[in-house]
Amino acid sequence: MKIQVSRNGICGTDLHEYYDGPIFIPADGPHPITGRQKPLVMGHEFSGTVVEAGPGVTEVQVGDRVAVEPIYRCGKCRPCVSGNYNLCRDIGFHGLMADGAMAEYTVVPQSQVHRLPDSVPLEMGALVEPMSVAYHAAKLSGISDQRTALIYGAGPIGIGIWFALRGMGVTEIAVVEPSAGRRASIEALGAETLDPGAVDVPEVIAERTSGLGADAAFDAAGVAPEQLYRWCTPARPENCVPDCGE
């Protein structure tokens, strides 16, 4: 179906592709599902309005406001048939293996489209994809209410994880962020922050938890593996959830 793009976010992956790519964009041959290769239009965090629908489209109709799940899957491999299409052996991504939403219009399969409720504006619809990443990370941690969590990075994914944990009932959340501007933004939402340039984060968390460590830690900053190891030291090792975003 053809979608008129309303809003499209710029993901960290887009920046890496632009400055250092091709990384995920097929360079040596067409993608096995989409048949596309470079050059491609990027953009996968978006919302829009359906303006054309093919004859086999039944779930949405022209005029519907939608958010798009950007995953292409074959539907035939073992992960796909078992319901784990995010592990498809030929997985593709809209805006990386097919022309994306940094354009006025883009075309996607029906299986990737989700109708927005009337209460959700298109501006918020563009946040569905990145916020689903944040929510998934929060759920993967297994953390429950009345627990302690650390989030490294107060960018969009870090903020999303903070919201998700709050919604799950987690009461003690510290956000580690070196940027004063980003600290101010998430503090305005009610978050507690730690400046790693001013305090020793593992030491602070150890003091707060009687040496036990946080119940979960999330990397929403995108850093080197050796730094991840250090960041996980203030968390209980079984509940460190690294590499959630950038």
Q: Where are these predicted regions, by residue range?
A:
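Mid-domain Rossmann-like dinucleotide-binding core that forms the NAD(H)/NADP(H) cofactor-binding site
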Residues: 120-199, 203
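Glycine-rich beta-strand-centered segment in the early N-terminal region that forms part
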Residues: 2-8, 23-78, 117-119
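Short, flexible surface segments
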Residues: 59-62, 145, 236-237
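Receiver (REC) domain switch-region micro-motif
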Residues: 66, 149, 213-217
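Glycine-rich cofactor phosphate-binding loops and adjacent beta1-alpha1 units
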Residues: 141, 184, 189-246
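Residues in the short beta-alpha loop(s) of Rossmann-like NAD(P)-binding domains
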Residues: 21, 178-179, 246
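NAD(P)H dinucleotide-binding glycine-rich loop of Rossmann-like/cofactor-binding domains
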Residues: 30-44, 72-152, 183
